[in-house]
């Protein structure tokens, strides 16, 4: 029997999962690592932490499964997108990785827009210049750390650094490369025009593959460290959201999913390229060769809930530890005591700036309507509602573009909360289906690995056979009507505060 390994490099940790050809989990292991925020709005991680987590989780899975490593036919890697990894001529990391959540590059985004032209940039890369994307991070290092930039010989994305450590190959694939702002997204190749205008050498970038293509095999050194066989193939893999799309079966028109992780995502498949000329949502190449996806991204989805838990719910965290339960269950119980609308309290979820729909690194979180009568449960529920309103903003933009999201699936850590699942259905005013497999991104890249190794004929046929959505979560029409009114007020708050946030950033 041939087995398939999926590795998911997230923001809070890495997870390795071994699957059989039927998509059943044979063994799994996770390992966490820290996030560094040396200044307000900055976010960095040490790539060595990723590699050590990969070694620990892969080796554990190989041992725990009892599978002959030679039977692991192929592996795929999913990862947090946009992070900048810079290597010298010896392949050594030159500085901590500036990751997706970092917001320091506002000036560099202005430079990119000026050098390429706003409309032309969107035509080529399908997106406006954004602080979260990789190109602005490269420009920041070039401007502020020129000595490091001069030593740079290879620029990689987070998951592709793991690929390099596993295989020795410098490679990436179209879905993740789309988030660098250096790819010709309609043409699925590096844009020489953008590279020339930004003064970035093509030689610094890795070769671009389609997601199911084989990019190499496990090296002798990686085999020794992980227990994998050198015969195990490594495929292109995918960025975290593109991988989740495969893992949730979102590989045909009309299919979409919501991810409530550290960030929040609304993602829809499209067999034809669709670009928002205002740049509010992102269009990337997807993991299905020859297709694309359109997605809206909010910076602080699950992050907002974790922040409110860590700030206000230390007693619940301690109680949950004693009871051996998830602290979020107790947090949800507090929120459930608050009515729809959180007693007229609205939360703006901009803890780390915002991407969709505002493209604003300076906006920050707000509680609007806070009064002496509000309790902890009101604040918690307001946070969950505010995140849900932010996700609905993306959904409305997709509807306006004609990108269908008829079959909406739900995944991510936030989807584990039954309370939040129902709340999302009520805010969206449409049914949701929970994915039965909790291993979305890892399963997605395992499927891609299976296609590359010849275990499956195509991405679509594999998803049809392996991925089954759960029962539908239907909206409460009465609550949905109330949320419609609250969402309209929510949408009025950003423009009212935009100038004030800009002034705050200058203080």
What are the language-model segments listed below?
Residues 1-95, 123, 151, 206, ...:
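N-terminal glycine/serine-rich phosphate-binding loop of ATP-dependent small-molecule kinases
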Residues 5-6, 47, 106, 113-135, ...:
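Active-site core segments that coordinate phosphate-bearing ligands/cofactors
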Residues 31-33, 210, 475:
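Active-site donor-binding loop signature of nucleotide-sugar glycosyltransferases
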Residues 34-37, 103-105, 302-303:
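A short local loop/turn or secondary-structure capping micro-motif enriched for an aromatic residue
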Residues 203:
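Catalytic pocket of metal/acid-base enzymes, prominently hydrolases
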